Amino acid sequence: MAMHKGKTINVALVGNPNCGKTSLFNFASGAHEHVGNYSGVTVDAKAGTFHQNGYTFKIVDLPGTYSLSAYTPEELYVRKHLNEEQPDIVINVVDASNLERNLYLTCQLIDMDVRMVIALNMYDELERHGNKFDHNSLSRMIGTPIVPTISKTGFGIEELFNRVIKVYEEEDPVLRHIHINYGDVLEKAIYPVRHALKLNGNVSKSLYKRYLAIKLLEGDPEVESFVKIGRAHV
């Protein structure tokens, strides 16, 4: 399938605090942004525009968060944006020098089944400490493109958005759907909940049922309320 230029791609930047996400946003958008928020919350997001290869990228820099649970205003804001706005592509900005902590959020994004490209940011810090990371192998393993970037200098940003285009056009060779296996005990618990959600057509048609099942098993109060509302309309 040939790429169709002249399209607008809605992109959300998601990552931990201090991962260089906002620096990436500022470099891409030229820091020409406006601030948006949801009523009733104290956190906000910056929105800007970026052009490359005939595409227009509408970028939202969401607040830094360590997870997509329902405990902090930042977590709720990011999750609300992903669920309600449903961006075309999520750029998950990851601190290359602190992978274990950062990839927890990545796993939750995979659970949500969002279309995603990972910016392996602060790549110079990884190299400065003499470390190496086979990001291509991880990319193939999780079915998600990974691009090394240094947001403060702009290194890798052009390639990052080229991969965003490929994922948007469903032309990236790495892209595939996976789910993270949480072991026999949890998987046996997830399956019947997911199946019940699938049978209820009025419950969140646009949201991935496996993700909802996991959140229900976690006792997530917001998802529990959401599912109850859906049942009330059956």
Language-model features: where?
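Canonical P-loop GTPase G-domain recognition
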Residues: 126-180
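Residue-level detector of conserved catalytic or cofactor/ligand-binding positions
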Residues: 228-234
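Conserved G1/Walker A P-loop phosphate-binding module
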Residues: 1-68, 85
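Charged, amphipathic alpha-helical segments characteristic of ABC-type P-loop ATPases involved
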Residues: 178-216, 220-226
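Conserved nucleotide-binding/hydrolysis micro-motifs of P-loop NTPases
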Residues: 31, 40, 64-65, 96-100, ...
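Conserved C-terminal guanine-recognition region of P-loop GTPase G domains, centered on the G4
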Residues: 50-54, 77-146
